[in-house]
Amino acid sequence: MKKIKCALIGPGNIGTDLLYKLRRSPVLEPVWMVGVDPASDGLARAREFGLKTTDKGVDGLLPHVVGDEIRIAFDATSAYVHRDNSDKLTALGVKMIDLTPAAIGPYCVPPVNLDAHLDSAQTNVNMVTCGGQATIPMVYAVSRVQPVAYGEIVATVSSRSVGPGTRKNIDEFTRTTSGAIEQVGGARKGKAIIVINPAEPPLIMRDTIHCLTDGPPDVDAITASVHAMVKEVQRYVPGYTLKNGPVFDGNRVSVFMEVEGLGDYLPKYAGNLDIMTAAAAATAERFAEQMLAATAATA
């Protein structure tokens, strides 16, 4: 089957984990890995897998975009450089999947709003953050039943799973995740907190979600909605587990999640990598299917 060719920008933890997932995709073919450090482990792994690489940043990729038929690019660098990367590549007709908190394109959380993006001509979609991908489906599971006045999430991740790019973007992480809790999750007001835990051995990703509903919560409907949404996320992140809840206390609905990774690049405790990269891969696969269908229709 024909595949859509892709480039990955940023060979850190997220970019390298994503590479493993794209190599298993039935519709995506990673062909380039872009970095800035010649000694990067991610670039070395990409070369081992047969990808072309450059340590000259996106400028090193641009001359090859058309010739190598790159249609989709994943940016796993940082919010500070994403806009420049996106402008250069979208000008060449490349669709950007943004894994930074830059959020210059609309937020995408696959089980909540991916279908809406397929119907639009967006050239750039933003995957929010790892904390957003883990928690916003739960906020939405409550808000689709009844209005949510306030949604608060706490994402706790292992220090070892958090690379330098994410550490530079902590403020952007909280702003972007809070915004997406409102715009995608459906809460009127959102707040996000990230805890980077230095414990050894590293702890698995844990997420706590609190929602304050308008009026007494509909216990049965919210419980059913939460369980249904967990199954939706598990379609692309099998290690997404409801540990407790939903717990009801007055107007507060609390959900407690755990996210175990597949162990592709970092061990299974790094579920924060997995939920981000799996969501990005799932999103890109839907775009690729759309591209392939359009090509077949005009053939």
From Swiss-Prot:
Keywords: Aromatic hydrocarbons catabolism, NAD, Oxidoreductase
GO MF annotation, one: NAD binding
One example of a Gene Ontology biological process annotation: catabolic process
Family annotation (SUPFAM superfamilies): Glyceraldehyde-3-phosphate dehydrogenase-like, C-terminal domain, NAD(P)-binding Rossmann-fold domains
Family matches, as InterPro entries: Acetaldehyde_dehydrogenase, Acetylaldehyde_DH_C, NAD(P)-bd_dom_sf, Semialdehyde_DH_NAD-bd
This protein's name: Acetaldehyde dehydrogenase 1
Organism in which the protein naturally occurs: Burkholderia cenocepacia (strain ATCC BAA-245 / DSM 16553 / LMG 16656 / NCTC 13227 / J2315 / CF5610)
Keyword field contains Repeat: no
Residues engaged in binding NAD(+): S161, V162, G163, P164, G165, T166, R167, K168, N169, N272
